[in-house]
Amino acid sequence: MTAKSGINKSIKPPRTNTRYGIDICDHCQDCLWRTDNFFCQFDPDTLKAFDSITFTNVYPAETVLYAEGEAPRGLFILCSGAAKLTISSGTGKTLIKRIVPAGEVLGLSSVLSGNAYKATAETTAPSQLKFVKREDFIRFSEEHREVSFNVARQLIEECESDANQIRALGLANSAAERLATLLLAWCEESGRPSASGMRFPVAMTHEDISQMIGTSRETVTRLLKSFRDKKILTVRRSSMTLHKKSELEDLIVP
């Protein structure tokens, strides 16, 4: 292992799943995707113990991992890919609670509390996940103290994310303000400078965006067209380029 990279060069490359076209890492110790999230930075002995209680699977996009209201069978670690958490009303209206990137954990709060899952978790891209049964995770966290810190950090991040969304949806005066807030957040999180502005990936449909900001798909389509016509941004198939950041900021009431 080199001091510079921290990468073990003896690690075998992941095998490729030809069905979904993504790589698979069966064991955490061999993982090439390690990030500073949850279990990724544990010592080798802890990772080995964790591997012994997990089940690795690969899922296509639009796979429901668990549904809102179900009893918590266990938690999922999103090794690669992406997922979304949605909540629904009795009338069938759906709101996207959060977009979950690779490296995060799904179902943690319900597994700890024993209460039903508070949202539906669904993959939005081909994804590798590790599943841990609830009773196995509870025992594992009791046996490995270092797990407790990461559990607390994950729960804090979830609370902050929920609070930010409530603020964006609950305090915004219009759909235009909510959309502007969302686009600026995406730009801040993953924007990269380009010749004409800040470019950031958008892997969501107008329907998905509408479910994130609590409005209709038609409203999202109309607002994005208005932003394009005013040359505030350019929309490509899987990305947007923000040209006039200040004009979006002006839509947000302090």
List the predicted regions and their residue ranges.
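Cyclic nucleotide-binding regulatory module and flanking cytosolic helices
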Residues: 2-61, 105, 110-112
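Cytochrome P450 core scaffold surrounding the K-helix E-X-X-R motif
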Residues: 86-92
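Polybasic "coupling" helices that flank or enter modular domains
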Residues: 142, 146-212
